[in-house]
């Protein structure tokens, strides 16, 4: 809360200042008669002590633009122009009134302008500079910070002595040639420092060329640096004579001019009814900004604390987990392993999956947990459930990374991706050629054996809660492997019912009891239901919500398959099937219909499912309708 108090104290002056502006000035408004102006919508604002060239003489006089040492700017189309009598026109891109400076860029090469004005007499070796009034007198040399430069013509090149190196610049490359060498010399210097063959080039009616002081990081260049930069074709900053306006502008007010008193004065910026509205608005905006700042700081503080708690929870788990396999990697190792995450091969519920390679050349899949929820639960679930088990039908976890809030899981790579790719493919040839009845049975049996191991073969029972085609990966030989244990839950092997705070899984595969306890308690039978829905999709090649089933758009997939089986109709999608293949598909469908019984007590265990699929049960009875019979049974 101390941080919030500091921020509030910092913003309170802003609010007070807005209130002050709304009431501080109720006098004749200078800006009402001398409003700021622009040459274009995005051009710099032009206001006192600068003036825009205007034909309105009376307005110029009352606004302090007539007969005073100020810069007068002009508009040329959309550009704001400042004209130098010798160096030519400049475009003004920005004006900073608080620092009394502006950024200017030559519209034409200053050196070229100077060349055109430099007249070398054919009969004399003494050049002259013609600066007779061929430009508008918009550049008052008494107004800006400047140095006077004298143009010097020499018959040979020379190097200034070290004591005078800051006062002599040249030779100016764009003016000089093999017989004429031109230098710019600070007019404050005695010309006796020059070689005898050097002559001053006369400038009409002037003692020299006025070079505006160039700024860099609010520091003035010295004479030599300025003289070298002036001929360059680049944007630069120049400063004008500050006078009394600088202190006024720095205090947050505006410099103005009183025509009656013929002097400058300082006033709020601006004032009157218009500023009252602006000030009131700014006060409200400042208050809103304060609230947003407080809310942001509070959010970031809570988020930081939340992330720290998650990090501590994960680290405590990993400390308890020990140093046994899988291997823990640093994030830099994971990034190198995944080739900087260039090859994305999939997207899961908790993050993206990238193809990578271990240092020994073994291909791997790297899952970056981007949307991990439940206080790091998905990461902990994955490591805790499959980190120490090894089964032919469960994807193997080879390593992991937990570094700050960045977490990754490294699995064995499955080249044939997920089962979903094949059973829902728009290319019917894929389904017909790869997922023939024999292969369908092998895949279903492999999944069933993997689930049986999770439910019965480990020290603790592992409930997956997200069995679906997307989470069944296929290896080189199309052997299935169960993956994605982000929603998994561990429980004792003798624990029949587990407690959940919310339903888990994917719509279409979630058992009824996860939605309503009227169907019974949540147990490993929820996974059996998901397996049944998966197998129904395998034998039909369609999603359980696919409207293309049958002739009616609203036919429920289990109901459609049940009617097919009970009426002895074919389910296989291959063009030609033997009677044996038809029987295998029918067997798969009957097992699936047993698995999706609404009453969990009527569903078989995965051990019994394996026996059903292997034919160990001699007579497989037709199950009751899972969507009618079970409901009636539960209601009776």
From Swiss-Prot:
SUPFAM superfamilies: Protein kinase-like (PK-like). This is Rust resistance kinase Lr10. The gene is LRK10. Its main location: membrane. ATP binds at residues 345-353, 367. The keyword rRNA-binding does not apply. It is a single-pass type I membrane protein. It comes from Triticum aestivum (Wheat). Disulfide bonds: none annotated. Glycans are attached at residues 56, 177, 222.
């Amino acid at each position: 809360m101390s941080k919030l108090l500091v921020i509030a104290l910092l913003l309170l002056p802003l609010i007070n200042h807005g209130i002050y502006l709304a009431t501080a000035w109720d006098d004749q408004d200078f800006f009402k008669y001398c409003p700021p102006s622009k040459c274009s919508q995005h051009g710099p604002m032009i206001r006192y002590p600068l003036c825009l060239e205007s034909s309105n003489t009376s307005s110029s006089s009352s606004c302090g633009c007539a007969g005073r040492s100020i810069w007068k700017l002009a508009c040329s189309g959309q550009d704001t122009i400042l004209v130098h009598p010798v160096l030519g026109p400049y475009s003004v891109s920005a004006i900073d009134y608080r620092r009394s400076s502006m950024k200017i860029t030559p519209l034409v090469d200053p050196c070229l302008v100077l060349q055109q004005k430099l007249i070398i007499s054919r009969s004399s070796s003494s050049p002259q500079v013609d600066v007779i009034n061929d430009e508008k007198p918009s550049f008052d040399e008494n107004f800006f910070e400047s140095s006077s430069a004298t143009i010097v013509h020499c018959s040979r090149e020379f190097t200034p002595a070290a004591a005078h190196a800051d006062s002599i610049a040249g030779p100016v490359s764009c003016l000089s040639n093999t017989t004429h060498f031109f230098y710019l010399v600070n007019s404050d210097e005695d010309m006796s420092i020059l070689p005898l063959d050097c002559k001053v080039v006369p400038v009409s009616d002037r003692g020299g060329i006025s070079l505006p002081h160039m700024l860099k990081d609010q520091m003035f260049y010295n004479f030599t640096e300025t003289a070298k930069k002036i001929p360059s074709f680049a944007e630069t900053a120049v400063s004008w004579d500050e006078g009394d306006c600088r202190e006024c502008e720095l205090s947050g007010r505006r410099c103005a001019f009183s025509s009656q008193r013929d002097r400058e004065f300082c006033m709020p910026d601006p004032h009157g009814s218009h500023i009252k509205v602006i000030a009131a608005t700014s006060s409200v905006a400042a208050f809103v900004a304060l609230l947003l700042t407080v809310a942001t700081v509070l959010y970031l503080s809570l988020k930081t604390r939340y992330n720290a708690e998650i990090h501590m929870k994960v680290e405590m788990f990993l400390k308890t987990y020990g140093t046994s396999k899988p291997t823990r990697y640093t994030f830099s190792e994971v990034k190198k392993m995944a080739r900087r995450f260039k090859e994305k091969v999939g997207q899961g519920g908790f993050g993206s999956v990238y193809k990578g390679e271990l240092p020994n050349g073994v291909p791997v899949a790297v899952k970056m947990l981007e949307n991990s929820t439940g206080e790091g639960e998905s990461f902990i679930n994955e490591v805790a459930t499959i980190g120490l088990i090894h089964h032919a039908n469960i994807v193997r976890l080879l390593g992991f990374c937990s570094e700050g809030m960045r977490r990754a899981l490294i699995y064995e790579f499955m080249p044939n991706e997920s089962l979903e790719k094949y059973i829902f493919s728009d290319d019917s040839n894929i389904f017909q050629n790869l997922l023939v009845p024999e292969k369908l049975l092998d895949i279903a049996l492999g999944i069933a054996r993997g689930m049986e191991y999770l439910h019965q073969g480990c020290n603790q029972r592992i409930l997956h809660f997200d069995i679906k085609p997307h989470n069944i990966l296929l290896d080189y030989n199309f052997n299935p492997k169960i993956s994605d244990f982000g929603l998994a839950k561990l429980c004792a092997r003798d624990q029949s019912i587990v407690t959940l705070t919310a339903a888990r899984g994917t719509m279409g595969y979630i058992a009824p009891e996860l939605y309503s306890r009227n169907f019974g308690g949540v147990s490993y039978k929820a996974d059996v239901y998901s397996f049944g829905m998966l197998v129904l999709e395998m034998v039909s090649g369609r999603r359980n919500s696919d409207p293309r089933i049958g002739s009616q758009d609203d036919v429920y997939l289990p109901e459609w398959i049940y009617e097919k089986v009970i009426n002895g109709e074919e389910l296989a999608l291959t063009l030609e099937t033997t009677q044996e293949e038809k029987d295998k598909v029918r067997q798969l469908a009957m097992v699936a219909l047993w698995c999706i019984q609404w009453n969990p007590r009527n569903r078989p265990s995965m051990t019994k499912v394996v026996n059903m699929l292997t034919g160990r049960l001699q007579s497989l009875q037709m199950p009751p309708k899972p969507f009618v019979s079970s409901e009636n049974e539960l209601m009776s």
